[in-house]
């Protein structure tokens, strides 16, 4: 059984409140990101910048004075100036179908060349390319865009979608398209050991206190982190605080191995970390789970971390307890590339 031993967090550290900017946690992930298998399958034009950049999971950048053969290099999708009727659009196939809750149409660094307006349509198809007779549903009506801005919108239609169409009127550039939602995963895991904190298996980030330099959902992504930006990283802590992230596992299960990967984090990795866990059967809100998590049992006691390394823990784990939520505490702050919790689903 898990034992409530180790560092008594609430007695030593102040418990930081959730920052208001964490608006896309609560189990939502970016369904459009390329590392989940999402692909651009059609675009009317990409003269100035290729459409595939719009689903890059990392934030857009601006390269001062950099030009390619067609003009200024831009980190996003940019079409040529339209000299005829109509508008430009692209079609995105999601890596996994899902229910869409929120979107962000990001025009960062596009100023004077952003679209006048944009809209979104969606459909469900088992084929790579939707048929011509398939009906597209408007999920975001035509709205004006601003230069160098994030455009956040809630999506009311909670149908399952597999394809997204981004319309830009009449032309222009968009840095990133974020489709935040819940992935539909066929959870037929059997008796094999799997990573219960992998987003591809259905794990989701619920709430964290900070993600200033790196998004919390990165920690659940497949594969090895590409760089320091491909991980969860918090701001520098000033005081007796610690940072934390709560994850809902892909399925309830018993954990037999934990891997904490600090790849690329060399001068900014956490000094120590601990893991708490719980098995919760009732539906709980992100707000209520924060307070309850302080009393969760310790899955992994306070352990030392090192730079740019995969830390594997077996013997130090408190085993033989079914869990479906994990809370990772990092002391006092810093960055982690991936967390992998291996076990069998039950």
Predicted features by range, described:
Residues 90-92, 101:
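General structural concept
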Residues 1-16:
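N-terminal amphipathic/basic-hydrophobic helices that include classical n-h-c signal peptides
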Residues 12-89, 109-244, 253-254, 264-346:
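Trp- and acidic/polar-enriched beta-sheet ligand-binding modules for extracellular glycan
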Residues 94, 249-251:
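A short glycine/threonine-centered beta-strand motif
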